[in-house]
Amino acid sequence: MKKYLFFLGLLFIVSCKKADTPYAGFSMYFEKPQPINDSELSKIPNKFRGIFMNSDSMYINIKENIILQEKYYKHRFHKNELDSIKTAFDLVGNQYVSKLNKDVFDYRYLGDSIEFSNKQIDTFFVFLDTQKAKRIDGQLVLNYKDSIYWKIKAISVEKNMLKIKYIYSEEDLKRIDSLTKVKSTMIDSALFLLKPSRNEFKRILNLKKLGETREYKKVKNN
């Protein structure tokens, strides 16, 4: 029963998970896609393509026209608990479908146990009018339009290690303002607008220990 309750708790966590939304409450936006005056890319450069995995077995799958975030969930329990598990699922063909969120789980028997597995795939980036990619100083800059302004993520690849930089804190803002001629503008108490020049943006990306950097090791070419 404990495993059953744990599994349902895990299912709830999976159902509540958002695609790459690690921070909330403080936001920095750019007036225009970064870096300004640089041409937009029409595809992801070869250097950045591949499948990368972090220490939590989260995958970043970078293809020519799209970047996906993938997570695999597995849970094993005794087959005697299957009747209890079934109350939260519908059996459709050879898969169990969650009544909570319609997630689909494959299953297999392993001796006296049964294993449920599920793959969550979220779109990290795709070329749209509201999502644009540019490149500067060897880094890939992903721009995401939110209403009329833009948020960014910066990606670099060095020695088969993918690094994704998130800029999100008040301390980050102070360091950015120290580099720019035009200081940030407060839109509301937790939202600031940035207008760096191209060279200033390049310097921002190269600041040491700016924001948080997540690392993924390359496990496969695309």
Model-derived regions: residue spans:
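Short beta-strand-centered aromatic/proline hotspots
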Residues: 61-65
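Calycin-type beta-barrel ligand-binding domains and close structural analogs
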Residues: 17-45, 66, 70-78, 83, ...
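C-terminal motif of bacterial Sec signal peptides marking the signal peptidase cleavage site
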Residues: 12-15
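Positively charged n-region of N-terminal signal peptides that target proteins for export
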Residues: 1-4
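Tryptophan-anchored aromatic micro-motifs
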Residues: 47-59
